[in-house]
Design a protein with these regions (language model features):
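P-loop NTP-binding core
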Residues: 1-252
Length: 252
């Protein structure tokens, strides 16, 4: 049965989608069975895996709202499988209001897919609305990317408050898988200070691997591929390979 991990931080620009795409590809390269569930209407994770976000049908929106079979929506790529998204997902939170047990729609879909995978990663939207609540209800744990910049921890208190509410009433088993430092630059005091502050806030929960600031990580999505394929010898690719080893070791 799959380890279902939501990659979540409502603050935009922290490397959430980059992390979801590249950890999927890195674990696939280790021989793991991996599914990326794109739960963001921008569908950048879908296109980052080489899937055309404008033509995929059925997709995760159809699964949630129109009752499409989850397995029929899955697209296989050489980097891992994808449950794709598209812009229709933007209105899903409003459409969910009338659906009974709406917080668990994604959970029910992923339960059908989980026996086929070792890992399922959910790329969450940059907000704390019903789609994110669905992801938190479906996940067993959370991977929280934190950018090594000023105000890095801003908004995390809101995320943690939402997590506490979900644990109390909807998903008591939810835990933090790990906190990932992204866009790290060892040459700056700021990155080092942020890293220390994050470790103080999340003792024992911060990954040893840090993701460096790396231009190849920024370029790869425009080519529709993970950085591991775009530039396998880049510092970004090496960091995600190390993170995959770290996550894999946690689950052995």
């Amino acid at each position: 049965m799959a380890n279902i991990i939501a990659v979540v931080n409502q603050k935009g620009g922290v490397g959430k989608t980059t992390t979801t795409v590249n950890i999927t590809a890195a674990l696939r390269a280790l021989g793991k069975r991996v599914l990326l569930c794109d739960f963001d209407a921008q569908a950048n994770a879908t296109s980052g895996m080489g899937v055309d976000k404008n033509t995929t049908s059925p997709n995760v929106y159809d699964v949630l709202i129109n009752g499409a079979e989850p397995q029929k929506a899955v697209v296989s790529t050489k980097y891992g499988d994808v449950l794709p998204s598209n812009k229709a997902l933007a209105g899903a939170s409003i459409e969910m209001i009338a659906i009974p047990d709406r917080e668990h729609l994604l959970q029910k879909a992923l339960e059908q897919l989980a026996p086929n995978y070792d890992y399922i990663f959910i790329d969450c939207p940059p907000s704390l609305e019903m789609l994110t609540v669905n992801a938190l209800c479906a996940a067993g744990s959370l991977l929280v990317p934190v950018q090594c910049e000023y105000y890095a921890l801003e908004g995390l208190s809101d995320l943690l408050a939402t997590v506490r509410l979900v644990k109390r009433g909807l998903n008591p088993k939810l835990s933090i898988e790990g906190v990932l430092l992204t866009m790290f630059d060892s040459r700056t005091n700021l990155s080092l200070q942020v890293a220390e502050e994050v470790k103080r806030h999340f003792p024992g929960q911060v990954y040893a691997t840090v993701i460096p600031r790396n231009v190849r990580l920024s370029e790869a999505p425009s080519h529709g591929m993970p950085v591991l394929d775009y530039d396998p010898y880049s510092r970004g690719a090496e960091a995600y390979r190390m993170l995959a080893q770290e996550i894999s070791a946690q689950h052995e």
